[in-house]
Regions:
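Pre-Walker A (pre-P-loop) alpha-helix and adjacent loop at the N terminus of AAA/AAA+ ATPase modules
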Residues: 5-36
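Short glycine-rich substrate-engagement loop in P-loop NTPases that contacts/grips substrate
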Residues: 11-16, 58, 62-98
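P-loop NTPase Walker A phosphate-binding motif
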Residues: 47-62
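Walker A/P-loop nucleotide-binding motif
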Residues: 32-50
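Loop/turn-to-beta-strand initiation segments
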Residues: 62-63, 98-101, 128-136
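A short, basic N-terminal segment
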Residues: 1-17, 164-165, 175-180
């Protein structure tokens, strides 16, 4: 998705302006540890806009890690399986923290548990302390996200990303779905 396609799909012009400015200033924004938080309904274009940010960062020579939250949590769990020959928890965590931009999609879809809350807080807090950028997407409003992942974690996300940008509208996937 490009900003022009998003504009034609009816994405909120204010959101497009903020995202466009972020893209134009990608280097300085990442150097400052700034990010974006995109919230809204299913299929509204959040992931596409976040991918545009990640793609622009990569094209500008920055390091980026892109995960859906379920995949990120599964990857963290896999670090506990020492006999699989993968990264240790510390190695993987250090990579998550060291990339210029961490892109986490579908924040809030995870089943809430103490372990999940601990992992999310650890990643977000460490990136907050190291002034590292994040772009996150969620279907939840801020209060619902606080209820799901904790007020401390959301507070740090607001510090990194600013308040959520609401990407609203109809599910853009339906008009593109093939007719049978």
């Amino acid at each position: 998705m490009s900003l022009e396609i998003a504009r034609n799909d009816g994405v909120n012009p204010v959101v497009l302006k903020v995202v466009g400015e972020f893209l134009e200033e990608i280097g300085s924004r990442l150097d400052k540890g700034q990010g974006l938080w995109l919230a809204g309904g299913v299929g509204a274009g959040k992931t596409a806009l976040a991918m545009l940010v990640s793609k622009t960062a990569i094209e500008a020579g920055h390091t980026v890690a892109i995960y859906s939250l379920p995949k990120l949590l599964a990857r963290i769990r896999a670090t506990y399986e020492k006999d699989l020959g993968g990264d240790s928890y510390t190695q993987f965590f250090d990579r998550l923290i060291s990339v210029d931009l961490l892109h986490v999609d579908d924040l809030g879809v995870e089943k809430r548990s103490d372990w999940v809350l601990e992992q999310l807080y650890s990643v977000v807090n460490e990136r907050y302390e190291m002034e590292r950028s994040m772009v996150v997407t969620t279907n939840l409003e801020q209060q619902a996200l606080e209820d799901q992942i904790g007020e401390r974690t959301v507070s740090r996300l607001v510090e990194i990303c600013g308040p959520p940008l609401t990407v609203d509208g109809e599910d853009l996937r339906y008009p593109r779905a093939p007719a049978y």
